[in-house]
Amino acid sequence: MREHNVTRFIYSSSATVYGIPEKLPLVENMKTGQCTNPYGKTKYMVEEILKDLCSSDEAWSVISLRYFNPVGAHTSGLIGEDPNGIPNNLMPYIAQVSVGKREVLYVYGNDYDTPDGTGVRDYIHIMDLAIGHVKAMIYQKFKNPAGFKAINLGTGKGYSVLEVIHAFEKASGRKIPYKIVDRRPGDISVSYADASLANKELGWRATRNIDDMCIDAWNWQQNNPNGYKC
């Protein structure tokens, strides 16, 4: 990139770099690196490499967008999430249960320190996330800030697993059978963003709520019960 004079870089990072939160909401200047899973560790390591790059060469401008939990689908219903094998994330798993592709949703733990005992996350619609990327590109093009800058992309509101299930039932008109099982190693109880920096620097704010996310995810899934056609 440097050889071809390309020195502006937008990195798809993750809120998992924060690890177990010291306090909430999560703010960009909080300590990172106490990651609870390999995915978060890799995101953290790349951020550290990019920080070193910016420190070694002031020509570089790097924005690290820390995604919270991207879900949903394009509003057209033509583009959606089609994971290989068994989904690792909540929303596509719920969607596959809703169309009968899977029999039951496994809820990992109901003994967290949350109102209903299930884990709470900040879910963000992929369309809001895409707009966040465009805003970051515009910011870099016209302001071209040197150095490394981390920016959260989230709604600032957390929803529990059970709240997401109920929202999807409302969107689909179908009951979602679920079973409570043991916690998964590495899962934390609560995570949600302070997204004020994105609003201040990029002029960005998430506009879609959990109902919108579930409606669009269901629209995609019911039209593509077996995912993309090969």
List where the protein language model places each region.
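Catalytic helix-loop patch of NAD(P)-dependent Rossmann-fold dehydrogenases
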Residues: 3, 7-8, 17-69, 78-89
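Short acidic, glycine/proline-rich loop/turn micro-motifs
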Residues: 75-79, 118-119
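Short glycine-/acidic-enriched loop or helix-start segments at secondary-structure transitions
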Residues: 20-22, 74, 162-164
